[in-house]
């Protein structure tokens, strides 16, 4: 399972909101880039960021802060908040962000997501599905649409989306545990990578997400409140995450001349994924 430690940016500061309410703000740092470096040092392989001001205003606000976060670390960064046009996407990618998260526009204009995928590639486009009581919220969670989270997720899959960040707004910033059931439904019904967001409060919550077969989890307040030790979580849930580097590939200890061929001149083999142990 991939872990995504989160940095929410408001007025250039690292903050957390309760249930997405902009009048319920806790400031954790005036230097978000230092938080990012700490996450990388703890072993994080990916960092999640949100421009909260941008989400509310509909355009990027904290560009310089996001740029400094990206330049301070060597791991990829994903970012959401205020991305409404193809030009916005290009601007954010130019900041050093690896992939962008699009929420409101996915609801209002699904064709925009297809155009974004066609132009930038599916690996750089993530859709944010943020729900209140099962219905998708937009514009910084200030408005609720008539679309269900599942219907939007399925529609996004049909146009080529490979990754969705699912947030249960009622859980966000509350340290009350994630909505595992609904997140698993999205994962099972769509078959694409679902990243759970909202409510992570302890290692047990991460275990439940992992056991449900969900691709990833975003952790925010639980790290800042020292309820989850990021380094310990990375060691437990991402034990094979860094093995993608060539230097970590296992080396064969047998030469070809030692192998026995069958009657057809072929070598019978069992192929196993060296990261997760799955027999392919």
Question: Across the structure, where does each feature detected by a protein language model lie?
Answer:
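Catalytic cores of alpha/beta
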Residues: 73-99, 181-219
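Structural preference for beta-strand elements that scaffold enzyme active sites
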Residues: 2-6, 46, 74-78, 98-101, ...
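Glycine-rich, proline-tolerant flexible connector loops at the mouths of alpha/beta enzymes
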Residues: 46-64, 104, 109, 165-176
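Conserved anion-binding
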Residues: 11-23, 90-93, 97-172
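C-terminal helical cap(s) of enzyme catalytic domains, especially alpha/beta-barrels
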Residues: 113-119, 187, 206-244
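Conserved, mostly hydrophobic/aromatic
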Residues: 8, 39, 47, 79, ...
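Flexible "arm" and connector segments at domain edges
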Residues: 239-280
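Charged helix-capping and loop-helix junction motifs
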Residues: 60-67, 142-151, 176-185
């Amino acid at each position: 399972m991939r872990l995504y430690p989160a940095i929410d940016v408001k007025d250039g500061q690292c903050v957390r909101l309760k249930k997405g309410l902009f009048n319920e703000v806790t400031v954790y740092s005036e230097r978000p880039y230092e938080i990012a470096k700490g996450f990388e040092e703890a072993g994080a392989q990916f960092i999640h960021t949100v421009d909260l001001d941008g989400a509310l205003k509909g355009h990027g606000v904290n560009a310089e802060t996001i740029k400094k976060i990206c330049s301070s670390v060597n791991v990829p960064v994903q970012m959401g908040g205020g991305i409404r046009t193809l030009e916005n996407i290009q601007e954010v990618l130019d900041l050093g962000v690896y992939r962008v998260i699009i929420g409101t526009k996915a609801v209002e204009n699904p064709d925009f997501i297809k155009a974004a995928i066609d132009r930038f590639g599916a690996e750089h486009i993530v859709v944010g599905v943020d729900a209140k009581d099962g219905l998708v919220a937009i514009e910084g969670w200030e408005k609720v649409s008539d679309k269900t989270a599942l219907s939007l997720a399925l529609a996004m899959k049909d146009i080529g989306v490979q990754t969705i960040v699912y947030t249960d707004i009622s859980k966000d910033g509350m340290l009350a545990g994630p909505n595992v059931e609904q997140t698993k439904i999205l994962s099972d019904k769509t078959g694409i990578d679902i990243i759970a967001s909202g409510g992570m409060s302890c290692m047990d919550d991460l275990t439940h997400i992992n056991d449900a077969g969900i691709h990833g989890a975003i952790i925010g307040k639980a790290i800042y409140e020292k309820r989850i030790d990021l380094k310990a979580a990375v060691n437990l849930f991402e034990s094979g995450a860094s093995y993608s580097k060539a230097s970590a590939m296992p080396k064969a200890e047998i030469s070809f001349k030692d192998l026995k061929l069958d009657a057809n001149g072929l070598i019978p083999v069992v192929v196993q994924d060296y990261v997760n142990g799955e027999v392919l």
